[in-house]
């Protein structure tokens, strides 16, 4: 029986791959179903012999309580965007200045959700969303229901891979046909449908919706020399990879590829929103490194957005948390990039003046980056004596006089007690990338502020369940959940708190770099501008902004209050002393280790202050070589790099 179960699992997984990944089934649906039912019966009779990669694991049936947070071992960076050929040429010049012979890999930018898959001994252990790049959500059970994600690799590997989970156009249409028939609201586009599906608590629905993936990266250190090699290796492991790609050192040829794909994209069975261009050499990628936000060795070209004409009916002016007043046009509704658009940003007063935008104008509307609706220009041929738009002189929230600083494009309200600014700051503090207080969204902030229960972020930690129960629509269960979420946020690592304070120019990545360096929010608040500016990836603008913020008396009082409520000020990630034994050294692991795993060796090196990379280059300081080290050892010897063995590492 065990042999038959093994045979059925192997056959069914192969047939599923042919159907879902290769679009080339070799058996009929009825034949597949017959074999599947046979396996189900055998597994009922012999549960002790169920294999971890059995296709029956994909059927669903679980109802999850929620999704736990997941700390990514390897951060998921954003990509720098490009919207023109000129920006790609500038990227090429930056790369070629360091590596004149660099070649690029151009790949399709799939319009889906980024996911990370971690395998231990070849078995899928964790599937997670991107989140903020450092912390995502554990959606393993849902990703197990995606038919082209292997549950078990043929090799006993420890590996973390990255890819895009998407909904094919055919599956999207089928879902919306069913929703229409049931009188339910349809999904606006395949990306929204994929996102909604991956956040389902009922895994049976996930299994039914036929999501798919394309893998594009090994996040864990790779022995491969090029991105092309990585993609071939991923495919050999059983992952789906996209075959629409091009390798070339010529940006002109890359541009021709982009033009061809853009022309043909509508015929693809899935949505794409651009082309990702990466330096093909892994060694060159390592040397080019990263900025605070993105790799220096990659860029994402975004296709020009779809454009539609609409009439401006009116304009709303709103105040953000930094006091910037933003105009938003109310439009006659139009369908744009799969969604109904009735509002679009006008950016700022200088933009309105430059484009001569007036109420009643017919304007061209597009989605910037396929996300944010914006007004591109006025269709002057359709203008009929519209009056020049009145620019507000007073803040729409507090009535204070607005200012237009020299050199800035935005109007600002500089009243620190402006109600809208306070509410926006409070909502930002509680947001996912900041203190991540579940249930503490803008609508709750509005209710609490209007009830005079909160006026600054410290007030959040004064709230009781009884306070929350005084608000309309808040019952005991939700009040208790919100209260516990507030208490739980006190234990966040301090970079979340720093970002939540909303300091100008200090984003989430900069917050993490700052706390990695200083370890404690108090120490950061007392640091000199020079010491902050010297941190790689930051600089003078951020240093000055922090210095200006922390020297305010009210900020010092706020920090004292947060301390009194036991809000954590310490960085909880790994910090390495600058006088650690290998501090500042770049180290490469190669060959087979006998007494420790590669991950154990990597962790030990990092704890000793080393930066562990996957490729040998002139920037490598040290190589730790096991048996069968191969070409990396040879290259290290040619470059005169110090070479140590496993015993040396064990004795450190």
UniProtKB/Swiss-Prot annotation:
KW Signal (keyword) present: no
Domain of life: Bacteria
Needed cofactors: Mg(2+); Mn(2+)
Gene Ontology biological process terms in this record: DNA repair; DNA replication
Active site residues according to the UniProt entry: 109 (n6-amp-lysine intermediate)
GO molecular function: DNA binding; DNA ligase (NAD+) activity; metal ion binding
Residues the entry annotates as binding Zn(2+): 395, 398, 413, 418
Matching Pfam families: BRCT, DNA_ligase_aden, DNA_ligase_OB, DNA_ligase_ZBD, HHH_2, HHH_5, Nlig-Ia
Domain BRCT, residue spans: 577-652
GTP-binding keyword on record: no
Reactions catalysed according to its record: NAD(+) + (deoxyribonucleotide)n-3'-hydroxyl + 5'-phospho-(deoxyribonucleotide)m = (deoxyribonucleotide)n+m + AMP + beta-nicotinamide D-nucleotide
Record function comment: DNA ligase that catalyzes the formation of phosphodiester linkages between 5'-phosphoryl and 3'-hydroxyl groups in double-stranded DNA using NAD as a coenzyme and as the energy source for the reaction. It is essential for DNA replication and repair of damaged DNA.
PANTHER family named in the record: CHROMOSOME TRANSMISSION FIDELITY FACTOR 18, DNA LIGASE
Protein name in the entry: DNA ligase
Organism of provenance: Streptococcus agalactiae serotype V (strain ATCC BAA-611 / 2603 V/R)
